[in-house]
């Protein structure tokens, strides 16, 4: 068990081991002195994903979200670090919420950017953008200061407080979510279900078929073939130096997303 703290002055994240009786041990630190580009860390959430422990850290001054894997000894390793762009809505981020749904982890973030951003955490600790909500008349999403989110009947209920009057309630329909599947060590077929699948390739040459749901297909280190199928799918391609094929590309351009590592 660890206690986690953020330092505005030093721009670092610290993990403190908790011993018998709640005794606090010597901390380990990760931040600007170790090369992590954060300024004014403002919020942190701890999540579990694929058997690993991660911290999601929001930093107001750098308009960034950092994902840090924490080992059993409390040592920290950065797995992703993303900075707000014109395509996202977390500049000046200071509010952060996470929701777990089965094997999935969803992240909602907001700040001074006139909206909120929805992401999901991939098994390797990277963040994948899913969408966002702009501030519109009748909403209070300007200068977001607090976000709370819960999973209710298969949907994510989000409550956001900001500079505007009132509290904004957003409902995110994630649809039915299937357990995560990982390809085997040999060349083969990995098939999804009718629900929303998270399908992960490995080192072999895999064929990954999503099926009917809104799926996330992540290629592995081999030469892979990805078939999204019906539904609004996301294909994630890594820089592995291998030739990968999205087999149903002509059919999916209008409704699918693509991400390249």
Place the predicted regions along the sequence by residue.
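Structured catalytic/translocation cores of nucleotide/phosphate-coupled proteins
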Residues: 6-7, 24, 59, 111, ...
């Amino acid at each position: 068990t660890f206690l986690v703290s953020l330092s505005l002055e030093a721009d670092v994240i610290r993990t403190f081991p908790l011993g018998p009786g709640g005794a606090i041990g010597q901390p380990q630190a990760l931040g600007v002195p170790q090369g992590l580009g954060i300024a004014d860390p403002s919020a942190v959430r701890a999540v579990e994903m694929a058997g690993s422990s991660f911290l999601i850290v929001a930093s107001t001054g750098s308009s960034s979200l950092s994902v840090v894997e924490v080992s059993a000894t409390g040592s920290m390793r950065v797995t992703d670090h993303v900075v707000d762009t014109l395509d996202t809505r977390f500049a000046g981020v200071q509010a952060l919420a996470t929701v777990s749904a089965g094997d999935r982890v969803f992240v909602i973030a907001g700040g001074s950017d006139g909206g909120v951003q929805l992401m999901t955490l991939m098994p390797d600790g990277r963040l994948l953008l899913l969408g966002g909500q702009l501030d519109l008349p009748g909403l209070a999403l300007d200068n977001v200061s607090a976000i709370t989110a819960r999973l209710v009947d298969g949907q994510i209920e989000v409550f956001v407080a900001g500079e505007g009057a009132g509290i904004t309630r957003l409902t995110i329909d994630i649809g039915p979510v299937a357990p995560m599947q990982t390809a085997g060590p040999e060349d083969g077929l990995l098939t999804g279900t009718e629900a929303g699948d998270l399908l992960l390739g490995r080192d072999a040459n895999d064929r990954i078929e999503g099926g009917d749901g809104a799926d996330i297909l992540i290629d592995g280190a081999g030469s892979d073939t990805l078939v999204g199928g019906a539904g609004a799918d996301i294909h994630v391609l890594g820089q592995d130096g291998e030739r990968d094929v999205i087999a149903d590309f002509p059919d999916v351009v209008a409704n699918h997303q693509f991400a390249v590592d």
